[in-house]
């Protein structure tokens, strides 16, 4: 069983990682192709392409200019500790022990517009390139065309090497679109997290993102290898709802008063 997650726009570049172990991204040669093109963009072009402020555009122009290989602990940081959004706050990898970090490394993969597919301990340098960005490149009009089946093939290889036949999709639609599900050689399970509001259960983005990270933390803390055991996930008041679920979409609900 493997999990896939989206990355985060917010990055923690300052705090040192709590572990020294690191690996290198498998698709760094592809990242280098993209970065060569990104470096050609002026800050104003970045602002228009990514729909960000001038300040953020300037920051990322500087990041692009400084991006260089090889990655080392001195100029890069492990992805799971660099990403700093709602999902990663829910996971809170900084407080996991060594065995639990190894669980993440062995069973979690992070989708990325620039890096394709990352292991949690893969070193990365700061960047901003969301998968849904309409960034015309050498292979097409956007990043989905750039990556093609590269991410899917690496996922299939990863699953095969581990003897696994299940992929738990905890990524956003924007990122999971980079995976060709028709060519994916695995059973696909997509957990859905719903919160009660005014008597109705609905997906609330902030809570759903945090819950994705919480589920990965739950799996690591309980060393889960059987997907069925994920139905016992109960962090922060969530509970599996069998009646609302089907074989591929597992729904977890949380009542309003529990928060």
Swiss-Prot record:
What GO biological process term is on the record, naming one?
A: response to hydroperoxide
Query: Cross-referenced InterPro entries, in alphabetical order?
Result: YaaA
Write the protein's name: UPF0246 protein NMA1114
Domain of life, per lineage = Bacteria
For this chain, the family text in UniProt reads: Belongs to the UPF0246 family.
Checking NCBIfam families in the record gives: PRK02101.1-1, PRK02101.1-3
Write down the species.
Answer: Neisseria meningitidis serogroup A / serotype 4A (strain DSM 15465 / Z2491)
Query: Which cellular component terms (GO) are annotated to the entry?
Result: cytosol
């Amino acid at each position: 069983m493997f999990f896939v997650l989206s990355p985060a726009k917010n990055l923690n570049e300052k705090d040192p990682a709590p572990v020294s172990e690191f690996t290198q991204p498998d698709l760094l040669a592809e990242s280098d192709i993209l970065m060569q093109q990104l470096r050609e963009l002026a800050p104003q072009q970045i602002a228009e392409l990514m729909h960000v402020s001038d300040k953020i555009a300037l920051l990322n122009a500087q990041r692009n200019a400084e991006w260089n290989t090889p990655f080392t602990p001195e100029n890069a940081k492990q992805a799971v500790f660099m990403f700093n959004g709602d999902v990663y706050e829910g996971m809170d990898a900084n407080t996991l022990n060594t065995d639990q970090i190894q669980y993440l490394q062995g069973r979690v993969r992070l989708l990325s517009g620039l890096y394709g597919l990352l292991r949690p301990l893969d070193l990365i340098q700061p960047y901003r390139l969301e998968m849904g960005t309409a960034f015309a490149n050498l292979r097409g009009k956007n990043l989905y065309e750039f990556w093609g089946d590269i991410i899917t093939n690496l996922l299939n290889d990863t699953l095969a090497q581990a003897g696994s036949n299940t992929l738990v999709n905890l990524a956003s639609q924007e990122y999971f679109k980079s995976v060709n599900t028709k060519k994916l050689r695995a059973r696909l399970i997509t957990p859905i997290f719903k919160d009660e509001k005014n008597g109705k259960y609905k997906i609330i983005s902030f809570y759903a993102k945090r819950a994705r990270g919480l589920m990965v933390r739950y799996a690591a803390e309980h060393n889960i290898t059987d997907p069925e055991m994920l139905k016992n996930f109960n962090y922060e008041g969530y509970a599996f709802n069998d009646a609302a679920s089907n074989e591929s979409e597992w729904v977890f609900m949380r009542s309003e008063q529990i928060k």
